[in-house]
UniProtKB/Swiss-Prot annotation:
Residues 160-255 are annotated as: Interaction with TRPC proteins. It is found in: Cytoplasm, Cytoskeleton, Cilium axoneme; Cytoplasm, Cytoskeleton, Flagellum axoneme. The keyword Cytoplasm applies. This is Enkurin. Adapter that functions to localize a calcium-sensitive signal transduction machinery in sperm to a calcium-permeable ion channel. Microtubule inner protein (MIP) part of the dynein-decorated doublet microtubules (DMTs) in cilia axoneme, which is required for motile cilia beating.
Amino acid sequence: MDSPCTSESIYNLIPSDLKEPPQHPRYTSLFRATIKNDMKKFKTAMKTMGPAKVEIPSPKDFLKKHSKEKTLPPKKKFNRCSPKKPAVPLRTDHPVMGIQSGKNFINTNAADVIMGVAKKPKPIYVDKRTGDKHDLETSGLFPKYINKKDYGITPEYICKRNEDVKKAQEEYDNYIQENLKKAAMKRLSDEEREAVLQGLKKNWEEVHKEFQSLSVFIDSVPKKIRKQKLEKEMKQLEHDISVIEKHKIIYIANK
């Protein structure tokens, strides 16, 4: 059995120089150049700290004497041929006083008030005891729209739009009929369309039932391939069902 003092040695008493571990390399961001370019876009010279990027003045444009002083505008020549303004009245001139009109303003104003149409008060309603007033027309309490002459009648623009849709459908049907003769296309009837739709839904239910019966753990390649195949079939069936449900009129080509 080893003694407990085997690790002790006299050489351990010799002082040794402690070596500092080397420093890790300084972190440098990979986006440093991108950030610098972005900062240069939004910064302007003479507005932020740092060396201002201004144009170096030319030695020829040195500062001259009186170059900073404001210059007077050019002197305009007085034109004596322009028309003169009327003279200022003298102090001795007095305006004509005592001119009166024969119009009776009192009777005229009274007649205007009597013959004028009385101002109708604005219809309002009060919903609180403190006198909170609101407009009656815009409140919805007054039957305004149901009393109109055209209430309940289909607007003209909707009738026009329906006619345009009907006309476009007729033109499309005529175009399809022409192509039917050329390409021998066949239109699916409502019964055939419903039968195809029900068949697709039935196929989807069968594939979905088979998909639900898969094991929880997919731990082999064949299981994974089978699961992907079932998912692809279900996705294709869902796409076909949505297309048939969305389009009421379907044409097929006779091969």
